[in-house]
């Protein structure tokens, strides 16, 4: 979802996804849009012999990963020295359960029921612990709030539902 906007802004983009179906749809859409994006059907764990990157965007992925420790370790290996990794996910809180699962999946039907497993959500300090273990230094933690009326996201100090951590590889 983020690859095309980043390419439109002039970034050299490699987009990866473990789902072949998602990659094929993304390739077709980027060709129709005239965007040059390198899409790869894989996961970070399998990309270790690949090139390294200045920036890695892990947006709304970590809460779907079975082995967060291995995932973060693999992403860290793909990051250049002094590179930045942005990791956005859902906090494991009562508020996130109500808004992200009951609200978004069951009431509003924005997502298929069962998309999220609340037990896989990470509290900010848990995610920070995984990042620190891999020598990634937290630069910023911000909440993200969605306004359903204007369909826009904005930065917030509220970490109770969605949040993003920017970390630096030193």
Explain the meaning of each model-derived region.
Residues 1-46, 70:
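Class I SAM-dependent methyltransferase SAM/SAH-binding core
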Residues 89, 108-126:
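Acceptor-substrate binding/catalytic loop of class I
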Residues 151-170:
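Core SAM-dependent methyltransferase catalytic element
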Residues 69-84:
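A short glycine-rich, Lys/Arg-flanked "PGG" loop and its adjoining helix->strand segment in the class I
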Residues 84-109:
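Conserved class I S-adenosyl-L-methionine
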Residues 61:
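Hydrophobic adenine-recognition pocket in adenosine-nucleotide-binding enzymes
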Residues 118-141:
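Short alpha-helix
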Residues 57:
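A conserved beta-strand element that flanks and buttresses the S-adenosyl-L-methionine
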């Amino acid at each position: 979802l983020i690859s095309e906007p980043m390419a439109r802004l002039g970034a050299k983009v490699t987009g990866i996804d473990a789902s072949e179906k998602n990659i094929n749809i993304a390739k077709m859409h980027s060709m129709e849009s005239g965007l040059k994006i390198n899409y790869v059907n894989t996961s970070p764990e399998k990309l270790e012999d690949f090139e390294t990157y200045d920036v890695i965007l892990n947006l709304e992925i970590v809460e779907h990963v079975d082995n967060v420790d291995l995932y973060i370790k693999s992403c860290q290996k793909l990051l250049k020295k002094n590179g930045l990794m942005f990791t956005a996910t859902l906090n494991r809180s009562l508020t996130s359960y109500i808004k992200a699962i009951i609200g978004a999946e069951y009431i509003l039907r924005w997502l298929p029921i069962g998309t999220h497993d609340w037990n896989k959500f990470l509290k900010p300090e848990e995610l920070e612990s995984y990042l620190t273990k891999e020598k990634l230094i937290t630069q910023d933690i911000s909440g993200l709030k969605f306004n359903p009326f204007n369909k826009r996201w904005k930065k917030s100090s509220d970490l109770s539902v969605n949040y993003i951590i920017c970390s630096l590889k030193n």
